[in-house]
């Protein structure tokens, strides 16, 4: 893990095609902009976790229903 201090207007480069800019800092909140190729998925961690949980719920299968479908 890398920990870096940045000020408003400064940026961080990841590889040669991702740039994270510090847009604003206010009351303990940091606003950033991210420039990356379209094929790079960028999600807030809490949103990623929510999607992950929904996907887990979606794959839970009632085995009795599967057995009924298999009998047909």
Swiss-Prot record:
It is found in: Cytoplasm. Keywords: Bacterial flagellum biogenesis, Cytoplasm, Repressor, RNA-binding, Translation regulation. GO terms for molecular function: mRNA 5'-UTR binding. One of its GO terms (cellular component) is cytosol. Pfam families: CsrA. SUPFAM superfamilies: CsrA-like (SSF117130). Its main location: cytoplasm. GO terms for biological process: bacterial-type flagellum organization; mRNA catabolic process; negative regulation of translational initiation; regulation of bacterial-type flagellum assembly; regulation of carbohydrate metabolic process. HAMAP family: CsrA. Homodimer; the beta-strands of each monomer intercalate to form a hydrophobic core, while the alpha-helices form wings that extend away from the core. Belongs to the CsrA/RsmA family. A translational regulator that binds mRNA to regulate translation initiation and/or mRNA stability. Usually binds in the 5'-UTR at or near the Shine-Dalgarno sequence preventing ribosome-binding, thus repressing translation. Its main target seems to be the major flagellin gene, while its function is anatagonized by FliW. This is Translational regulator CsrA. It comes from Clostridium novyi (strain NT). The lineage of its organism: Bacteria, Bacillati, Bacillota, Clostridia, Eubacteriales.
